[in-house]
Amino acid sequence: MRILFCSNYFTHHQIPLSDALYELTNHNYCFVAHKEMDAERKNLGWGNDLVRPYTCSMADQEVQKQLNNLDVLIAGSFPERQTKEYGKKAKLFFRYSERILKTGNSLLKYPKRFFHWHACNPPWRKAYMLCASAYTAGDYAKFGLFRGRCYKWGYFPETIRYPSIDDLIDRKAKATILWCGRFLDWKHPDDVIEVAKRLRDAGCCFKIEMIGTGEMEQQLKRQASDAGLLETNI
């Protein structure tokens, strides 16, 4: 099976699904980006570590290779003229979109888009929607589009299996509690010592950090030391 995914540019959002399709199709998968990623996103780190063997530009020969006997086309933000050209060669056609009613549910703001979307997705074209948002299907349904023809985006979270949950808990860092204030009687910093005693007696793994200065500082250190908390928990 040959799959061609076309969009404006390749981002980390598409990596897990693209990696899976690349392997499932025995490397007959290609992602086509039609423009360079803008500087703002690059500065945010979007372009880092995005080199993949299946990514290419519209001018690459790999695209023409994929178009020969193309089975599936997935089209996101891509020039419509090219999308139609590629779509004619595909046996199965998917649109790829986030939600379209991001500023509310008023349809009166979108009359031009209504006609544009219907022109790009006529009822006689058997097209499907690959939803990049939980709201995509509902938004397009309000315009009478892709009803009953929407599919969820593919997620591939890593599953880590540990031989022992108890060992994992033992390796976890201690929970940290921060108390910050002046060490004064009416601030009741000594209550922190009492809390620490209760947590220790309950078998909790924790560390308390106290930040501040004041007349009770030495008293608090003595209380923590007498309770056996100074070196271990506070």
What residue ranges belong to the model's regions?
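N-terminal subdomain of nucleotide-sugar transferases
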Residues: M1-N48, Q64, N68-L70
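Short N-terminal targeting/anchoring amphipathic segment
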Residues: R2-F5, D60-R81, F94-R95
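Glycosyltransferase donor-sugar binding loop
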Residues: A33-M37, C180-L184, K207-L220
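Active-site proximal beta-strand in glycosyltransferases
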Residues: Y86-N105, L130
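Nucleotide-sugar donor phosphate/pyrophosphate-binding loop at the beta->alpha transition
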Residues: L101-N121, T159-R161
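Donor nucleotide-sugar binding/catalytic pocket of nucleotide-sugar-dependent glycosyltransferases
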Residues: W124-K172, T176
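Conserved donor-binding/catalytic core segment of Leloir-type glycosyltransferases
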Residues: D166-R198, E209
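Nucleotide-activated donor-binding/catalytic signature segment of Leloir-type glycosyltransferases, i.e.
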Residues: Q218-I234
